[in-house]
C-alpha cells in the first residue's frame, strides 16, 4: 500500500518492488554501492552519502550511474562471521546490477559492507578501524592498501578512520550506527555521558579524533553528540 501511494505522488521516480533470494543479510550491507559521475567531472558515492546534498535529482538523472560489487563474507568469514553459507548474499550486488542493467565495477575479492562506509558526497569517507582492519575482512592488506582500494573504487580523496564503533556491535563496529554526515563538513556522533558505560571511552576517542582532522575540502568538522 505504501509503495502504491508513492506511485501517485508527483515528481517522484516510480517505485519498483522486486524479490531477490538471499541467505541472511540485509540490503544495506550486500547491495551495490552506487556511484555517479558528477557535473564537475568527479565521482560521487550515492549509496553512502549522508543526505544526498551533493547531487540533485536532475544531476543523477542526467549522469552516468554505476554500481560497485564488493565481496561479502557474513561480517568476518571463517574468523568471526555470523553464518557459514553466504553465497546468495555475496551475489546480491552483482545480480541487482544485472537485473536493472547498471554497469558494475567488480571489487572482489575485497571484502566490504555498505554499513562500514559513509560518504559526504564531496570526497570524504568515514570508516572505523575496528571493522575495516578486522582479521576477518582483508587480512592480507595493510591499512594504507585498504585506503587505496576505497579511494580507487569510491572516488574519494580522504578517508577518516574512527578508532571504534558501537560497543559489542556484531559487525565489528560498522560506522553507520556510530557516526554519519548530516551534510558535508558536519557529522553526528553517537554519545553517552555515562563514564561507566563502555561506549563512553569509545565515543570519546572518536570525538577527539574527529576534532583533530579536516575533511577533503580542508574543513574542520562540526560535531553533534547524540
Which residues make up each language-model segment?
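The feature marks the mature, well-folded catalytic cores of soluble enzymes
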Residues: 1-51, 55-226
Amino acid at each position: 500500500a505504501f509503495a502504491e501511494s508513492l506511485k501517485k505522488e508527483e515528481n517522484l521516480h516510480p517505485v519498483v518492488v522486486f524479490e531477490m533470494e538471499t541467505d541472511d543479510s540485509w540490503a544495506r550491507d550486500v547491495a551495490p554501492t552506487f556511484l555517479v559521475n558528477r557535473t564537475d567531472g568527479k565521482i560521487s558515492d550515492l549509496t553512502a552519502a549522508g543526505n544526498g546534498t551533493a547531487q540533485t535529482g536532475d544531476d543523477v538523472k542526467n549522469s552516468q550511474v554505476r554500481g560497485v560489487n564488493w565481496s561479502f563474507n557474513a561480517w568476518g568469514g571463517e574468523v568471526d562471521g555470523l553464518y557459514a553459507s553466504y553465497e546468495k548474499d555475496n551475489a546480491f550486488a552483482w545480480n541487482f546490477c544485472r537485473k536493472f542493467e547498471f554497469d558494475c565495477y567488480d571489487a572482489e575479492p575485497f571484502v566490504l559492507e555498505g554499513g562500514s562506509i559513509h560518504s559526504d558526497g564531496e570526497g570524504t569517507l568515514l570508516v572505523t578501524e575496528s571493522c575495516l582492519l578486522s582479521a576477518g575482512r582483508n587480512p592480507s592488506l595493510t591499512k594504507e592498501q585498504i585506503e587505496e582500494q576505497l579511494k580507487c573504487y569510491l572516488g574519494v580523496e580522504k578517508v577518516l578512520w574512527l578508532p571504534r564503533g558501537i560497543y559489542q556491535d556484531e559487525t565489528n563496529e560498522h560506522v553507520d550506527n556510530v557516526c554519519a554526515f548530516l551534510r558535508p563538513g558536519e557529522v553526528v556522533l553517537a554519545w553517552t555521558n555515562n563514564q561507566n558505560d563502555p561506549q563512553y571511552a569509545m565515543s570519546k576517542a572518536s570525538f577527539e579524533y574527529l576534532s583533530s582532522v579536516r575533511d577533503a575540502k580542508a574543513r574542520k568538522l562540526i560535531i553533534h553528540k547524540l
